[in-house]
Amino acid sequence: MKDDGVILETEKIAVSETNKNNGALRGTIKLQCEEQGEHAVNTANKFVIKGGRQLRGEVEISGAKNAVVAILPATILADEPCIVENVPEISDVEICFDILRELGASVRYLAPHTYEIDTRAIKSYSVPYEKARKMRASYYFMGALLGNFGYCRVSMPGGCPLGDRPIDQHLKAFTKLGAVCKVDRGMVDITTQDGLKGNQIFFDCVTVGATMNAILAAVKADGLTVIENAAKEPHIMDLASFLNSMGAEIMGAGTDTIKIRGVKYLRGTSYAVIPDQIEAGTYMVAAAATGGNVLVKNVIPKHLESIISVMEKIGVRIEQFDDAVRVSVDGPLVKTSIKTRPHPGFPTDMQPQISALLCLAEGTSMIKEGVSEQRFQYVDELRRMGADIQVDGKVAVIEGTGRLTGAPVKACDLRAGAALMIAGLAAQGVTTIEDIFHIERGYADMEGKLRALGAEIEKRAITQSENIPQPDQEAG
C-alpha cells in the first residue's frame, strides 16, 4: 500500500454479484432539518443544476470546517477574548456560535469571516440535545468545558449519519486524565474530583475527534500528557497552533505522538483558520469532471498531496503554486484503485467525490473504504444518474460509463451531497438535489462559487406539497 491511497493489485477485493443492487452567518443560515410547528409549511431548498458546462475561472477556498468546529469551542479555554479569522460561512459554524451564546459567551462580528469571541462570562456547562443533535462536532464542547471548568454535561452528538461512530475513545481520554464519565439517556456527564492530571493516553484506533478532544482537555491539566497513536490531520495541527498562540505548550501535533504540558493561563489571540483541504479537493474534482480549467486559490498544496496524487493517476493535470493549484484535463480519464486512510493517506471525506469522477473514467475502478462506516450511502443516488457501481461491504467497484444523466436525487450526508453536485455538473440534462442542508453544513456558498465558474445552478425553495402524491398517483 502506498500512502497516497492507491491500492496495489494484490490488495484488490472481489465484489459479490449478489450485492450488485444493494441499495450566510449571523442568523442568515437556517437549518433545514429543524423540526417545525404542527401547522407550519415544511419548507426546504434544493439545487437545480443544468449540467454539461465546463467550469472555468478561479475559486477561493474558505476556512477549514474540520478545524473551525474545534477552534471555536477552544476559545472557552481562553482567559481573554479571542479573534478568529477566515471563518467559513457554513451552518456548522452558526451552530457553534449558538452553543457558545447559550453557554454565556459573546460572539461579535468584526468583518467578513472575522469574529471576536469572549467566553469569560460563561456560567453554563451544559449543551442540550436540541443543539448537539445538529452537529457531530458538538462533542468538542466536552473537552473544552471539561478542560476549563472541570465539569460538563453534553448531549451525544448528531451530524452526518455515517454509521456507528462511537465516542468511547473520547471518554477513555477524559478518564485517563482523571475525569469520571457517565452516560445516561443520551447525556454525557463528566466530572473531576481534584482537577485533571496529565497522563499517558493510547488510542485503540486512529481517531481525529478523540485526538482533538484530548488536546482540549489536557491543555490546562496539571503535568504532562502524552497522546500516542494520535491522528495527524491538518486540522489537528491547526487546533494545536491556535492553542499554542494562546500560550499552550503542545508539541508533536501532526505526528502520532503528541505531548502537552499543562498551563494555568491562556491569553487571548488573533488567529486565522487554515484553508479547507476537502473543499479544495471538491472543487478540484468538479473542475476535472466537467473537463474544465480552474485555479483553486487559498490552499496549502502540501495538505492536498494525496488528493493530487490520485487525481493525476486518473489523468487530471494539476499545476502547483505557493498557495494555489490549477486543475485541467487534456485527455481521457482513466481507471484507478484507491483505499482511504487516515492522513497522510487519501481522505475518506473525498471518497464520494472521487467516486463521481471515476464514473466518467474509462475502465473498472475500485475504492476500498478504510476509515468510515456506511460511506457508500450515496451510491444509489449516483445509480439514478446512470452510474454503474457495485458495493460489497467496504468496497465499491465502478464501471466507468463515460457519461451521467441528470435526475432527481437526495443528499444523505455532507460529502455525498458534494458528490451529487459534481455528478450533476458533469451530467447531461437537469439534476435536482434535495436535502441540501447537508451540503450547507460544510461548504460556504457553494452555489455562488460554482456559478462564478460558469455552472448553471440555482437554489429553489420546495415545500412538503411537492412530495405528496396527487390523488391519481401511486403513493409507492
Feature annotation, model-predicted:
Residues 2-476:
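Short, structured segments at the rim of ligand-binding sites
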